[in-house]
């Protein structure tokens, strides 16, 4: 048994839905359900959960008879497939779990059964937690900040996915499965690094270029993008032409959102959240890259501070000499040699201390000397 490309999906993906659009192709003649099937939660870790037309057509009615589809359960998981073998349908029964935590029984056969057995084997594998963590890490890199709680909310439904495949007991080749799991984890880790590089480098370059264009436009026209309507043509005929060209591609697009319509460059909520995320990622990368250098510089500064700070008992001797010689605080070489013997410091340290001490007391000495000269002048004037 080999894990081909069709089975490389994560185990949290639900089984594919089958929609019979052709009237000539009829659905399987029998539906073996022990009870009326109910709606199931959205695909696990499948963030875009917009309800499509095909999903609404396949959604079963509620138990109260209402045919409306619940907004919170956009997809109905159908464990029903057909496998014809000599005119008979070969089926197996597995358990499923609906949104209310109740168990439902469905019929699975053929390729659906094989795919479900692969997913069950992956769920029971020891590396499944590591695989799921790598998959979620890739999602968190490229997901906007305001959408991250949706990932956590879907992770809380992990027990329902495990319960859904718990009844399958198909044995898979362990060596082949180990090889698949290990290579898939390595692939996801590499993909995460590529996503981080894209978010930190390419996306930031695009945002910066967009900001520069915005500033250039404002400097040339004097109008900020938020004040304008994003239109570059003033004639109604030209405006209608732009709208018709946009509608040719997609009826849901308008001139403000289309690049060919030169819409406003005002960032959306997701773009702002992406910018914040890019800034945080860049700040984190810078901290990690320069962390060792910052620590070395800090240690060097602290070492110099510790080296420049003299012990308290030695400074007391120097301060005492300063007070006794405050009128002329310039020690001679003999005084310095005596201070070296008394304090145990080096001659360079004593010289630096006196230089700094004179700088600290420079203002006080100048003020006292000026007052002394004024007093002398007054005395000489009176005499």
UniProtKB/Swiss-Prot annotation:
InterPro entries: ELK_dom (IPR005539), HD (IPR001356), Homeodomain-like_sf (IPR009057), KN_HD (IPR008422), KNOX1 (IPR005540), KNOX2 (IPR005541), TALE_homeobox (IPR050224). It is found in: Nucleus. One of its GO terms (molecular function) is DNA binding. Residues 374-383 have a biased composition (Basic residues). Its main location: nucleus. Residues 362-373 have a biased composition (Low complexity). Pfam families: ELK, Homeobox_KN, KNOX1, KNOX2. Residues 281-301 form the ELK domain. Residues 302-365 bind DNA. PROSITE patterns: ELK, HOMEOBOX_1, HOMEOBOX_2. GO terms for cellular component: nucleus. This is Homeobox protein knotted-1-like 5. GO terms for biological process: cellular response to ethylene stimulus; detection of ethylene stimulus. Keywords: DNA-binding, Homeobox, Nucleus. Belongs to the TALE/KNOX homeobox family. Residues 1-35, 52-73, 361-383 are annotated as: Disordered. May form heterodimeric complex with the TALE/BELL protein BEL1, BLH1 and BLH2. Interacts with OFP1, OFP2, OFP3 and OFP4. SUPFAM superfamilies: Homeodomain-like.
